[in-house]
Each structure stands twice: as structure tokens, then as C-alpha cells.
Swiss-Prot record:
Residues 176-254 form the Thyroglobulin type-1 domain. GO terms for biological process: regulation of insulin-like growth factor receptor signaling pathway. It comes from the Eukaryota. InterPro entries: Growth_fac_rcpt_cys_sf (IPR009030), IGFBP-like (IPR000867), IGFBP1 (IPR022322), IGFBP_1-6_chordata (IPR022321), Thyroglobulin_1 (IPR000716), Thyroglobulin_1_sf (IPR036857). This is Insulin-like growth factor-binding protein 1. The keyword Coiled coil does not apply. Residues 121-131 have a biased composition (Low complexity). The modification Phosphotyrosine is found at residue 161. Binds equally well IGF1 and IGF2. Interacts with integrin ITGA5:ITGB1. Interacts with VHL; this interaction inhibits HIF1A degradation. Disulfide bonds join 32-59, 35-61, 43-62, 50-65, 72-85, 79-105, 179-209, 220-231, 233-254.
Amino acid sequence: MPEVPAVRAWPLLLSLALQLGAAAGAPQPLHCAPCSAERLALCPPVPASCPEATRPAGCGCCPTCALPLGACGVATARCARGLSCRALPGEPRPLHALTRGQGACMPAPSAEATETKDPAAPETTSPESTEMTQEQLLDSFHLMATSSEDLPILWNAINNYESMKALEATDIKKWKEPCQRELYKVLDRLAREQQKAGDRLYKFYLPNCNKNGFYHSKQCETSLEGEPGLCWCVYPWSGKKILGSTAVRGDPKCHQYFNSQN
């Protein structure tokens, strides 16, 4: 099975922010770095044929053309005014669908429908609810995927964390899989750091683990500064950087180190 492309810029997915943030207090949003006047001046003009301009998906600074009715997802352009990016009715894994660009721009629920909801009814919405929208992902918690290449690792991280949160603390201490252990520690530390007043995390490292709990050979830092973070190559069994490899912005071509050893 081919290696899943590693993340270049991925903060924390919504379920992680909710679950880990709750452990240390109210979850704090992760914000993109501010756009400087210099960066905004470099933005190309929106095409004249664009009926509506909107903020970009991700931590970029340049406006894009909003999507009409049709396909959408976490890393696509935002839906036009009055539309909301939602998983299709009956989708068993709505968050998965949105990260794969398999949602749809639909008319947003009317205010009247929202007001007629029984206030006494229990709240049943969860991070995997069918009501999960692109707006909740990108606005409420500032969860930004800067390109379609980030999405496989996003879903990979969701799968890893879903298995983690079902375990007791004593089970976690018994883990032998190095990447899975490190990922849990990193997420726990990030959740605590986000509680500190005035702190703004614009770069950090989120381990890229495979389904067996070891490392993918390509690892990248998360960047919320509108450009890809650095990527490097590691040994899958230890996560240690491969001797002779260099950190680059983009694909470090990790396969070359393993091919040379054959």
C-alpha cells in the first residue's frame, strides 16, 4: 500500500480540539498567522467573472471565488453566501466525507427552522454529526488544511485519535508503538499550551503515524503562516531523522533513502 502523503500544514482537527481541550478547560481556537500588508499586496485579482469573492480555505491570505451549489470540502473554496458545506444525508462518516471533498454546498438552514427547535430537547450533535459543516471546521475552531495533499494525513490523524480516546490511561502507558505514543503526548501538550493566555501557536509538529502506530517516512511541521512547513525523512520504526536527509518545503522524496539501501 503506498505511503500516505504527510501533512504540510495541519493544526488540530475538530474532534481533537473538543476532546483534548475539554480535559484542560474550554478549548481555545488555533488561529492562522495574520496577513501582512506586503502579503496582501501580492495577491492576484479575483477574476471579473467571479460572482462572489470569499476568504480562502486554509491559512492563505488571497481571496478566492466562492463555490455555487455542488461539491465542496475542507480544502476547497468556501461556499457562496446562503450556502453551507455539509455531508450528504445518510453519510455514515460525515467528517471523513468533508475531508475528502465529498460534501455539497447546500442552502443553509433557515433561521425559522432553527428557532422552532425544541429548547428542551437534548443536544446530540457530536464531532461526527451529519450537521458538521465546513464553517464549523474552518471558522469555529480555525481548523485549516492548506492543500488537498494535507487531507490524507488529516483522516489518518482522526483514525489514530478515535482509537486513542477509547482507551484507559493505563492502556495508553502500555503502548509499544512509538509514533502513536508520541502523537498522544503531542496532542495533550498542545491542548495545555492553548490554554495559556496570549499564546499563539503558528508552527508545531504533529507526528504522522501509520495504521500500525509507527512513523510514515515523511514527517512535516504544521504551519499556520500561509506557507508549507518544513518536511523531512525519518526511519519508520523510530521516528529519528534519516542521516544525510535535509528538511525542505515540499516533498523531501524519502523513498530515495530506502531505495538506496536495497
